[in-house]
Amino acid sequence: MRRVSNLAFNQEFPAVSGLSGIPKDNRVKLARDLRNAFDADAVGIWLEGFPLVPLGWLYRKDSNREAVLRKLDEGGTLTGHVEVQNRARKAIKVVVFWL
């Protein structure tokens, strides 16, 4: 089933990656962020080719988060892409994936 979640963007990502923006044709991997000191159940979003730091995370109250954590805990892998959607005339970064 296709899922869309808002992306909590990692403000440190541009400096670490050297990218000034997210490539249009991107691929991301969803995985537990075991190095997140603030959230033991953080779901990180890693941009393909940049494994050192996550591009961002799913929000704690995201409606897809529990299902994503279950899938990851069962040994599943989740991939998708990031896109910008316009909502109420605001550009919002979202991660689109299949669950």
What are these regions (language model features)?
Residues 1-99:
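Conserved active-site motif detector
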